[in-house]
Each structure stands twice: as C-alpha cells, then as structure tokens.
C-alpha cells in the first residue's frame, strides 16, 4: 500500500492490568475527490474510481472515473447556464474571473503542495501556481475588450450600417492538457468563459489533484453553477462523446494523439461542430495566453441596420 500504511502508537492493556504502549500499522484514509457539475459536487454515476499515484508509487487520492451519464449531466448544466452567462455584462464576467484569481491566491500553499505530490519540484510548483493566478487576471482584463478588438464596422454600398461582432458559440467541451495540470486547465477554462461560453472540462487523468481542488475555488468565486463543469477520468472513454453530443457546440483537444484528433474531427464534421486542436502548446509560456484563444470559441455575427437620409443634402446613397 506504500504510504497508505502508517505507523501509529496506541495504548493496550497488559495481563497485569497496566497500560503499555504498542505499535501497529493503520491504513491511511485517502481523500475521495468528487466531480463538479452544475455547482454541486456529486459522486460519479458509475460508482467507479481509480487511485491517483505519483512516480514513486505513493497513493495520493481516490479519483472518480466519470461516465457518459456524468458527461450528459454536465452538458445539461452547461446549456442551462449559457443564456444567463452569455447575457451578463462583459465587465461582470471580468469581475468574476478576477475573484477566481483572488481565491486561488488565498489557497496558493495548498496547490503548491498538491503539485509537489504530483512530482513537481517546489520551485516549479510555485511558478505554476503564480502563472495560473496571473493568467486569470490576464483574461479578466480582456473580458470587456476583445469585442472592440475583433469586431468591425464594414463599408457597404447601400444605406446600411454593417457591424460584425464576436458572440459566444455555446457549450464547449475541453480535454485538458495531461501535463501542466493546473496552468493548462486554467489556460483553457479562462478564455472559454471570458467570451461568454460555458464549458465541460475533462481534467488530466495522470495529475488530477489540482483540477478537482480548482473546482472548490470556482465554487467560492461567484461563478454561477453550470458555467464550469469539471470531470475526471480516462480521455479514451469519453472523448468520442464530446464530438458526437448534439448539444455541444465546440470541442477543444489539448494533446498530440493523432487517433483522437482524427476521430474528433470526423465526428465533429458529422454534426457541424467546431473542433480545435492545441498541440505542443507550452502553457506556462507567454504564448499560452492570447486574446485569440477567446476568439477561437466565438462566432462572428454580422448585423445590417438600415439608415436613410445621410449626407449633407439628405439624399441618401
């Protein structure tokens, strides 16, 4: 059982009635990390779990193996939250993202400890948590600015104003990076919700601790239930359903498995779903953040607004 067994000193009664100290080994209680759906922390519908371990074989926690039913429940929660979240003022979405950064800062020590349990050095863990906090602040600042950057007023040869404005695409399903389990997770969640989308995230299978702890940060950060939903488990069991589910509008895959990429693209094409592949992205680097990641899950809406009597003489066009 590795470190799951720990020595404990106990008191026992000897034959003559006197207390004596004896030593025995007890089973350490591993925390069970639940999934996060609709602002709640349910257990997986399947009742299946796996034990997360590090490279030294130390058992860290019990992790839910999410099922297709869990994924469907998460999509329903994300769809129900979409109308309210996309209709919020962009400035308010920025405030909520900034609040997430504040709450992550308050629990910095916990996340550093969890990263170190998952084989990161202390220096690397401190750096990853700091970058994750800064990344949330970065996207909080973009919430009310990206539309001005990517929106346009188009010249047209008729008596109309013509505007093209980015709007959220809807429910986005994300297969998060397997490495960089915290900063990679934050770097895919933040631009998705900054643009008004809701999301369902499948966290890292091999390093899931920070992902589930991050859901506790989300739950205490004014994020409405259903805007962010975090599942844990095996990508090989769920990724195909990400692309085939008819109520998912876009899929983001962070990985280099060509088989998964091909199947996502084929199934996504079958129901006209946007499929985004982020391969070999160094998420802790500055290139891991950009307003163009917000644009990736936006649709450009063009509006024609009729006008009359323009020009000095009021003669129109």
What do the PLM-derived regions correspond to, one by one?
Residues 2-160:
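N-terminal Rossmann-like NAD(P)+-binding subdomain of aldehyde/semialdehyde dehydrogenases
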Residues 2-16, 24-25, 134-149, 163, ...:
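C-terminal segments
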Residues 55, 141-224:
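Conserved small-residue-rich beta-alpha loop and adjacent elements
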Residues 57, 93, 196, 228, ...:
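Residue-level signal for inorganic ion chemistry
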Residues 124, 160, 237-238, 260:
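Short acidic active-site motifs
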Residues 161-162, 230-246:
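A structured beta-alpha segment of the ubiquitous adenosine-cofactor-binding alpha/beta core
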Residues 190, 250-254:
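Periplasmic-binding protein-like
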Residues 190-193, 241, 267:
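Hydrophobic/aromatic ligand-binding patch that stacks against planar heteroaromatic rings
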